[in-house]
Every structure is written in C-alpha cells, then in structure tokens.
C-alpha cells in the first residue's frame, strides 16, 4: 500500500468517527466526569481509537505501533520490556477500543512522566510531516500554528481549517526546504543538521500543535524520543518565490557583485510589493508582509498601503511592536563556484551583515511563531529536572528565515549543487537568507492560548453538550519565560 492509499484510508477512518462523534459515542456515558478529565487525555484516547480502527482493517501496514503498545500495556496493567517484540493481535486490540471511558479514567491517574511519554511517541510517529499520513490525520483536530491567527482574530473556531495553497510558490517552497535547512545549519547556527520533528501536540491542552521546519538544541534518547535542551532554536522557513529571478537580472547581479545593505535594499525594493514593509516610527504596519523596518532606505516610491488592525489585537499591537523593533536581522549573501570537471557547484558565503528589519506582529506568521515557541517550551519544561528554576534565557527561541534564490543558468542546469559535501540535483541557487528573531510577549502569548482554549471548549459544548476541559499550562509557561527578579 503506497502513501496515498494509506492517507486516503486513514482520512476515511478519521471522517467516519470525528472528534465530536467520538466524544458522544464513547464518552457521553461518563459526561459528569468528563469535565474533570483534561482534554489532553481524551485526545490521546481518540488517537488510540483511530489507530485501532485503521490497523484492524489494514494488517499489512500498521501505524502508531509504539503508541498502541504503550496504551495497551498500560490499560492491561502489563509491564513488558521495551526490547521485547509485542504481538499485534488486532482482534484483541479491537476489544480495547470499547474501553475508552476506562482508558480515560486510568490515564488521569497515570504519572505525568508516562503521559508526556505518550505525546513524545506521537511526535516520533509523525516524523516526515507532509510525507507521513498520520501527521496529516492528527492535524485535522488540532489548532495548528497556521490556524492560530484566524481563530484568534475572528473568534471563529469551526470555520478555520488552515490555509491550503497548492500553487507553484508552495511547490517551490517544499522542494527547497531541505537545502534551506542545510544553509541555516552550516552558515548561521554552525551545527549539525538535525532530523525534522513530527507533530508536537501540546501535552497540557491536547488542543494545540506545532510542526517545526528546523530546530537545533535538541537530542534524542535511546528510544528515539525528543529531548529539548536549554536555548533550543526554532526556525520557520519562508521561501520567497516572488523574488526568484535569473542571474542576469540587474538587481541580482548587483547584489552578487557588491553585497552590501544598499544593493540588498535595492533588490528588495525592485519588487512592486517589497518583502520588507517600510513604516515611519510610531506608525502601525499593514498585515501584508511579515517583515518590516523603520529604515528609510527601504522606503518605496509608491504610496504605502494601510489596513485596520483586528479589534482584539488593537490594545496590544504597540507593545508587540516595541518588543520586536529592537531586534535586527542577519543577511547572508551566497554565491557559487563551478567545478566543471566534477559537474558540481559549490555554495559559499559571500557576505554577512545585519539590517534593522524585524517581524511584523500584525502578520499571521508572528502568531505562527508564538505557538511554535509555546508548545516547544512545554516540552522543555517537562524535560527539565527543576522547572521552577528555569530562567527566561533558557527557553526555546524562534526565528523566521526568509530564503531568496536565483534560477540556474543554462550552464548550471546539469551541475549538482554542493553544500558542505551534500549534493542537491534540482534545486535552484541560494542567493541570500534573512534570519529574523521573533520577540514574543509571554503575557500576550498566554492571553491568546487561554482565549482559544475557552473558545474551543464553548464550541465543543455547543456541538456535544459536553463540558470538556481544555487545560492549559500558561502559568508554568509564564513562570519560565518571564525574567525573574534578582534575589538580594
């Protein structure tokens, strides 16, 4: 069975018993107790049941084996050594499908370490992201980073299923994500390229989820489970297709010939809608572009566009701007050297400089970054031996990487692109990266998380009459992220 068939079958299973139907069918009998059960527990049970139903009819392709084994053993009270091969008897597992109320109640009494382990199994089982059918299935009932902005600003939960674009820009972005990740690792972070993570479901609420494009400052234990270290770095990658041009383009050639901020700003302004929005200090930006600046050398000739700020964001936008306007971006300009005898193009760093460019907090990508940082911080807190002693400088930080490429020349078409001995065959040529740190306001992040949890609970109640508890961990997040006063 190929990936498309697996995805279609798993999607059919998910549609056959959506989350609301699962709540009514399996948990309505314990409706008085369900409001005392954190939704994170309910979510694990729903994932378990979905996997059981899929695997029962597809013995030739078992999904989520480790998660099923752990929950099966827990429910049965069995203790099996991790190295032992546990038999997957689907007929027996299907019987456990009817024990969801018991499983929910039992997991509520389970040690936090065990529950956190289950969420780490979910992450491990969904690695590969878009190439993993389970990743797609679990995102269905999750407030992901791409949905956060719309849900928060419109107060409408059910209508937002996330943006889905399938144009050439998205295809190019997906095609170049691996090479961009490699460039960040070699030329910015200067660390080894790490495996991409799967879906990070928020272990406190079970409502939120994040999928990271790149992450550093992590490790994996002997079971392959994620371990988040202090000062982990998160990178959200954005491929700017609208700047993909030929090498002979005037602004491309000028940037390569004399890589300075002047040639860089000229390149940015050469597009009718510049990727960096200029505003005078004190003015509120539009929400069109996710990067902005107060620097006049990025001021376009045409009239600046304005748009209203969503009402719920209006009281906070100036404070969020003040936090982020102090950040600077790093620009790395690349060129390549051809080795015709070896049929290779080796990429090298031609220049690096900083620019007064920062993230626009009115843009949806800012909110995307907030959720990624929040969820990753939950994993860091759970991994920490003394969470109460976490300093604000130790929690994960997030950067947005803007990738600019140029097209290959005719002579370069047959050459392999080489970055640190790794070869890329079809990708275009890197021109520049803009690496921009995001400065979140922990109090604002907590407000967003709390508001959406309440909104989510109300929507579930309207659909099922069940009072489901979407527990958040905003207090422990705030304690970790806010600078602690120095003791005398």
Curated annotation (Swiss-Prot):
GO terms for cellular component: host cell cytoplasm; host cell nucleus. Disulfide bonds: none annotated. Its EC number is 3.1.-.-. Transmembrane segments: none annotated. GO terms for molecular function: DNA binding; endonuclease activity; exonuclease activity. It is found in: Host nucleus; Host cytoplasm. The record marks 177, 213, 236, 238 as: Required for function. Interacts with major DNA-binding protein; this interaction increases the nuclease processivity of the alkaline exonuclease. This is Alkaline nuclease.
């Amino acid at each position: 069975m190929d990936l498309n068939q697996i995805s279609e079958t798993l999607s059919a299973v998910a549609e056959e018993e959506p989350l609301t139907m699962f709540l009514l069918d399996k948990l309505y009998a314990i409706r008085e107790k369900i409001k005392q059960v954190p939704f994170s527990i309910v979510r694990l049970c729903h994932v378990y049941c979905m996997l059981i139903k899929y695997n029962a009819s597809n013995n030739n392709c078992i999904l989520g084996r480790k998660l099923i084994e752990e929950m099966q053993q827990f429910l049965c009270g069995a203790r099996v050594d991790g190295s032992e091969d546990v038999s997957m008897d689907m007929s027996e597992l299907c019987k456990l499908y009817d024990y969801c109320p018991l499983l929910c109640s039992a997991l509520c009494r389970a040690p936090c370490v065990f529950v956190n382990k289950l969420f780490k199994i979910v992450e491990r089982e969904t690695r590969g992201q878009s190439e993993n059918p389970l990743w797609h299935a679990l995102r269905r009932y999750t407030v992901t980073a791409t949905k956060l902005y719309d849900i928060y600003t419109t107060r409408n939960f059910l209508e937002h299923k996330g943006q889905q674009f399938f144009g050439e820009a998205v295809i190019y972005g997906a095609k170049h994500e691996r090479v961009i990740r490699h460039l960040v690792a070699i030329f910015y972070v200067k660390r080894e390229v790490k495996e991409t993570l799967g879906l990070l479901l928020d272990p406190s609420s079970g409502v939120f989820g994040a999928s990271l494009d790149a992450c550093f400052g992590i490790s994996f234990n002997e079971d392959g489970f994620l371990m988040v270290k202090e000062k982990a770095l998160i990178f959200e990658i954005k491929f700017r297709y609208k700047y993909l041009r030929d090498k002979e383009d005037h602004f491309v050639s000028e940037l390569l010939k004399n890589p300075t901020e002047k040639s860089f700003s000229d390149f940015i302004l050469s597009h009718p809608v510049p990727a960096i929005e200029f505003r005078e200090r004190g003015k509120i930006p539009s929400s069109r572009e996710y990067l902005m600046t107060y620097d006049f050398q990025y001021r376009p000739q045409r009239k600046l566009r304005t748009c209203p700020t969503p009402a719920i964001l209006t009281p906070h936008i100036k404070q969020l701007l003040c936090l982020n306007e102090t950040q600077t971006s790093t620009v790395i300009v690349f060129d390549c050297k051809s080795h015709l005898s070896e049929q290779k193009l080796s990429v090298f760093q031609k220049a690096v400089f900083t620019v007064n460019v920062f993230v626009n907090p009115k843009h949806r990508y800012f909110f995307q970054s907030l959720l990624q940082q929040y969820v990753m911080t939950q994993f860091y807190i759970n991994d920490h031996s003394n969470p109460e002693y976490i300093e604000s400088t130790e929690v994960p930080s997030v950067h947005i990487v803007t990738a600019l490429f140029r097209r290959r020349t005719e002579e370069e078409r047959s050459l392999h692109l080489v970055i640190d001995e790794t070869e890329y065959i079809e990708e275009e040529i890197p021109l520049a990266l803009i690496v921009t740190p995001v400065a979140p306001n922990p109090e604002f992040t907590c407000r967003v998380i709390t508001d959406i949890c309440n909104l989510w609970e109300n929507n579930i109640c309207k659909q099922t009459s069940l009072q489901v508890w979407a527990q958040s961990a905003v207090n422990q997040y705030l304690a970790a992220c806010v600078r602690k006063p120095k003791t005398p």
